[in-house]
Design a protein with these regions (language model features):
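Active-site cores that bind ATP or allylic diphosphates and position pyrophosphate for catalysis
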Residues: 103-242
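N-terminal Rossmann-like or analogous alpha/beta NTP/dinucleotide-binding catalytic cores
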Residues: 1-125
Length: 242
């Protein structure tokens, strides 16, 4: 759980938010606040409470309509955690040990805990409990959807056809958003652009975005222009051609 920035919601905010906004009128859409997942990195209950509130406000401010979307808090659905346990007794250790996200998070300084190690199992329960068919994720979360499919298939093989096998929806463009310094946008690099930052801060950050040495009037290469890469995230094809 974190305030919206151009990069992140768990992995990528745009990766979840844009598809959710676009799909909410055509599909049965479920969005949840992952407060149990957040416990792997947040221990202060007051901080967690504020993050939950902020995340809900972010969803609503960006265009999520509660009349079209089922928006809920993970901890309010006890069945998710029951299912997580049922899946855990079927999950081979080797399956979890192969998950690169655990190793990445440990390398970034998070404590090596069972909760962090078994994160993919709770994520599988999140997905399977609502019978999701499409799951918007980043490339770094694709493996977790594959774990979900493996666990669902194993459960179905033992107990019958209970769970639907979900498919990941991956936006390749969003997985590599450039930060204001030209590197991959990341809070650890301190190069993010917060959606709800003040105009003054946004103005300063935008002016710091790394560009080439060409004059404003010169023709730019859209594939290597950082400004255009950000513009593409919030524009349609016609606007990009213009």
């Amino acid at each position: 759980i974190a305030r919206l920035q151009l990069l992140h919601f768990s992995t990528h905010h745009l990766l979840l938010m844009k598809p959710a906004i676009e799909m909410q009128k055509e599909y049965e859409t479920f969005l949840f606040i992952a407060d149990y997942h957040a416990l792997t990195s947040v221990n202060d209950p007051n901080i967690l409470k504020n993050l939950i509130r902020d995340a809900v406000l972010d969803f609503l401010a960006c265009g999520i309509n509660p009349e079209n979307v089922c928006l809920y808090k993970q901890s309010d659905v006890p069945q998710v955690h029951e299912l997580s346990w049922f899946l855990s007794v079927l999950a081979p250790m080797g399956l979890l040990e192969r998950c690169h996200s655990y190793k990445d998070k440990i390398a970034k300084g998070l404590d090596s805990t069972h909760g962090l190690f078994s994160y993919p199992i709770l994520m599988a329960a999140d997905i399977l409990s609502i019978e999701a068919s499409i799951v918007p994720v980043g490339k770094d979360q694709k493996q977790h959807v594959e774990v979900t499919r493996d666990l669902a298939a194993k459960f179905n093989n033992i107990f019958g056809e209970v769970f639907r096998l979900p498919n990941p929806l991956i936006n390749d463009r969003v997985s590599s958003i450039p930060g204001i310094d030209g590197q991959k946008m990341s809070k650890s690099y301190n190069n993010v652009i917060g959606i709800f930052e003040s105009n003054e801060i946004l103005d300063k950050k935008v002016k710091k975005i790394v560009t080439d040495s060409k004059n404003i009037e010169d023709k730019k290469d859209p594939d290597s222009c950082n400004i255009f890469s950000l513009f593409k995230l919030f524009s349609n094809t016609d606007e990009q051609k213009e």
